[in-house]
Amino acid sequence: MPTYKSLTLILTIALMTVGTATADVTKSDQKQSAMETMKIATISKMYQQDIDEQGMSNPAVLQQYANTELQAAMTLEQAYFDKNQMSCNVDYDVLWDSQDPDYTQDKKLSMTEQGLVQVSLAQGSDIYYELSCDDNDKDCQIADVILDDDGKTLRKHLLEACR
């Protein structure tokens, strides 16, 4: 009989441990899902503002949603323009991957496995955003925009080209 009680005790402890591990995984999945929802909501809000203002926001809508590092790179670009009367920025609207954006085109927002927000535009372009989020404020900011398949980013481009 003591063996039976020992076995029951071991099984009970094992099931409690599995239950706790499952709860931790569920909490982690929920936190990940909430973070993804926050990221997509931020990008969706940014695009809606750009559509509403037809790209005429001042400062630019991307700068309004950027974190401090990306804002600093964008400020560097403005200083370069003021000094040299020429742009060191990319020569198109990054949000729409176009020089003449179609604000009415359909777009689809999704998450990549790398945690980037992907915006797939009806014109066939995909734009990828890296966001930094603060759990406490339920707020996300754009840390960078991936410009090409080689992984070149807007922030890196501005820091290199606008010196």
Where are the language model's segments positioned?
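Short, aromatic-enriched amphipathic alpha-helices that serve as compact interaction elements
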Residues: 31-57
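Sec/Tat signal peptide C-region and signal peptidase I cleavage site
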Residues: 19-23
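Short, well-ordered alpha-helical segments enriched in acidic and aromatic residues
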Residues: 55-83
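Bacterial N-terminal signal peptides that target proteins for export
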Residues: 1-8
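Surface-exposed, charged secondary-structure patches
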Residues: 24-27, 74-125
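Bacterial N-terminal signal peptides
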Residues: 8-17
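Hydrophobic/aromatic beta-strand elements that line small-molecule binding cavities or substrate pockets
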Residues: 127-135
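Low-complexity, intrinsically disordered terminal/linker segments enriched in charged
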Residues: 112-114, 125-126, 144-163
